[in-house]
Amino acid sequence: MTEIERHAHDVVVIGAGGAGLRAAIEARLQGKRVAVISKSLFGKAHTVMAEGGAAAAMGNANPNDNWQVHFRDTMRGGKFLNNWRMAELHAKEAPDRVWELEAWGALFDRTKDGKISQRNFGGHEYPRLAHVGDRTGLEMIRTLQQKVVAMQQDDHREHGDHEARIKVWAETTVTRLLKDGEGRICGVFAYVRESGTFVVFEAPAVVMATGGIGKAFKVTSNSWEYTGDGHALALLSGASLLNMEFVQFHPTGMVWPPSVKGLLVTESVRGDRGVLRNSDGKRFMFDYIPEVFREKYATTEEEGDRWYDDPDNNRRPPELLPRDEVARAINSEVKAGRGSPHGGVFLTVVDRMPGGAEEIRRRLPSMYHQFKELADVDITAEPMEVGPTCHYVMGGIEVDPDTGAALVPGLFAAGECSGGMHGSNRLGGNSLSDLLVFGRRAGLGAVEYLDGLATRPDVPDAEVAAASAEALAPFGRPDGENPYAVHAELQKTMNDLVGIIRTESELAEALETLDRLRARVAKVGVTPVAVGAGDGRGYHPGWHLALDLRNMLLVSEAVARAALERQESRGGHTRDDYPVMSADWRKVNLICRLSGDASAPVTGAHVDLRRQPMEPMRGDLIGLFETDELKKYLTAAELPGGDAAAGGGTGTGGDAAADEEGEQ
C-alpha cells in the first residue's frame, strides 16, 4: 500500500505567487495555521515575470488620477464585461495595498520629491503603475516572501517553531481537492515533486491562487507551472468557470531566436516612448485605432510624441491602446506581409528617450539584458523583433467579489485563476495590484468561513484512495501514449485553432481534435525512474506532465467551447466571422461546469456551457461615464433612463449570479 503523509492546517493556499502569498499572510495575521503549496521553488512564482508595475491611482504623477478614473479605465479595457464590483474594489483598494507593500520593504522607484514613481501603460489615462525599474513582480515576490519569513521568525520566538503557523511546501503539486460527505472542502491531495511522496493536507478552507493556462498554447510568455491547475481543480470539485473564451495575447513577446519565442517583452518599453514599426518603417498603430477609443488617442506622430511631456493638452499614442487592440494590429501587419524577418514587427526605443542609451539601460534594465544575452540585440542601438504571445486568461473561477468564495463551500480563489475582474481584456499593471487586493480578500474570506464552521469536516478515506489511484495510474501503462507527444499536439491545436483570430469552423475542428486527444490522454503512460521514492516516482517530469495533461485538456475544452458559443468580437476574443461587438452579448456571461463523472474526468466527463445574465451596474458607478460612451457598449434599455436602467444591482456584484447558480 502506498504511504501517504498527513498534515492538518486551518487554511491551505495553493500557489505562492502574489495572490497566494498575500492570502497566506492575511490568514496568518488573523491567527490561522496556514500551509502554502508552491508548484515550483519558493520565490520563483510566475509573478516575478510581471515587469511593468502595479496599477494604483495614487496620483503621484498626475494629481487628477483617482479611483473613479481607474475604475473607468478598467471597465473600458474590459469592454464593460467586467464584474463591476470587483473593478470598483480594485480601484479603491489598490493604493493601500501598494503602500502596504512599501511598508513591508518594497523598494519602488521614486519621483524627484520622494514619492513612488508611476509610469504610463496602455489603457490607463494617467501614469499609474508603481514600479521597480522593469522588475516589479520580482520585487513584489521578494517583499512578500520576506514578510512570510518575518512571521515565521515571530512564531519561532513565540512557539519555538518557525513553521508553527505558516509552512511553505515548495515543489509540491496538488492533484485533487478533497470534499466531505456534505460537499464541503476538507483538504487537498498532493505529491512532492522531488521524492514523489503523496501528501494529504487536511483543511476546511482552500485558497486557489495557481495562475493561468498558458502552457496549453505553443507560444506563450508563461512558465512551465501554468497548466491550468486551479481552473481544472475547481471544475473537478463542482465549481464553475466564468468567460473562459477571453485569453489575452500580449502584443510583444520575443520572436527570435526560436528557443525564447514567446518570452515577454514588457509593455514598459512602449510606456517609456517605445514605438512599433512594420518592415516599411511605418508607425502602423495609427491605422488601427478603433472607433470606441478614437477620441482619446493621437492621430499623428507629432501629437503622440508631445503627449509624453504634455499629457494634459495632447492625446496618447496608439502604441498604448489596450493589449487586445495592439496584438490584433501586429497580427494584421504580419499577415499583410509587412512583418519583420522572423514573423513579428519592430519595437524600438532607439533615439526615443532624452537620456539616450544610459536612460534606456536605467529604465529598462531587464529588457536590455534579456535581448543582449538571448538574442544578441542591443536595444539602445537597434530595434527589437516582437509578436503576440499567449500571456493571460481573463476567464477563471466564478467567485464572490467581496470574499473570493467559489460555489463549493470552503473554496476561495484569487489572482489569474479567478474570473470577472478584467472582463474581456486586462489592462497592463492591473494584474499585480489585483493579486494584492483580492489575495488579501480571499485570505480574509477563508478566515471568516472557517470561523463560522460549527465543526471541521473530516477527510473521507475513499477520497484519498481515489486521488492516490488516479495519480498512480500512468505507471500502470508503461507502453502507453507519450505525454510529451500528446502535449505538443494539444498546444498546436490551441495555438492554431483557438488563437488570436477565431472562426466557427476552426473552433469546431479544435473541439473535435480535443475529443480525440481525450482518448490519448487517458492512455498516457510512464515508467518508474531510479531516483527518489523507492517506487520510482522521484524527479519524474514525464509523470508530472502526464498528470498535468488532464488539467490542460479540461481548460482547453472550456476555452474552445466558450469561444464557439460567443458570436461576437470583444477584448481577448476575436471572431473573424463575427467581427464586431454586440451590446446584447455584453449582457451575457458564459459559465462552464463539469458534467458526468468527475472521478474519471478524461473519459467520463465533459465541459457543459450555459449563459448567465450580467448583473446591472450600480447607478452611481454608471454615472461616472458619459452617455455617448455608454452607447458604444450598452443596449438602449440599459442606458440611464432605459427600461432596464442601471442601479438595480445589489451592490455586491456577484450575489445574484451566485444565487441563480445555487438554484440549478
Language-model region placement:
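Conserved redox-cofactor binding core of oxidoreductases
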Residues: 97-197, 209, 253-257
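Short hydrophobic core segments
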Residues: 12-14, 201-210
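Glycine-rich loop(s) and the adjacent beta-strand/alpha-helix scaffold that form part
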Residues: 205-263, 425-445
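An anion/pyrophosphate-binding glycine-rich loop and adjacent beta-alpha core
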Residues: 240-373, 445-451
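FAD-site-proximal beta/loop scaffold in flavoenzymes
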Residues: 175-200, 377-417, 421
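Conserved N-terminal glycine-rich FAD pyrophosphate-binding loop of Rossmann-like flavoproteins
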Residues: 40-73, 248-251, 259-263
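Short beta-strand "acidic-cap" motif of Rossmann-like dinucleotide-binding folds
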Residues: 32-38, 243
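Glycine- and aromatic-enriched mobile tails/lids
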Residues: 2, 7-9, 18, 26, ...
